[in-house]
């Protein structure tokens, strides 16, 4: 059976009302990629409250983006100068007090740690490493969908309530 498989879930409501008229649509039942990367089969879902306010969650891939934090801060300082640039950076990142590196086991976290140490030049934050996994991504690749996935038949429209988890 043909199907369209997405690697992201609700993602800031960007997938709401999504519908495929002729093909089955499959996507992870997660409100954002952070929840998905923190999920581990052997532990299960973390409650939304475990995703801490004030934490900026990062992975190695995040640091490879040419518009990631360091290049962004450098660009702001270059355009606006030191004083105004620092104010702008504070407005963007001021509510974050901790950067949580998600160790999914898919890459060497040491390189990520080095990057985060450089981030401290721009932000006054603590840095920690938290355990995550690629369990959901592996299920996407294998097609081994479980109750962590939403499967829509052709013509079905994606609704926010489909992302709700039945608490046990």
Q: Predicted regions: what is each one?
A:
Residues 1-4, 58-73, 152-168:
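Extended, charge-rich low-complexity interaction segments
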Residues 88-168:
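Extended, basic/helix-rich recognition subdomains
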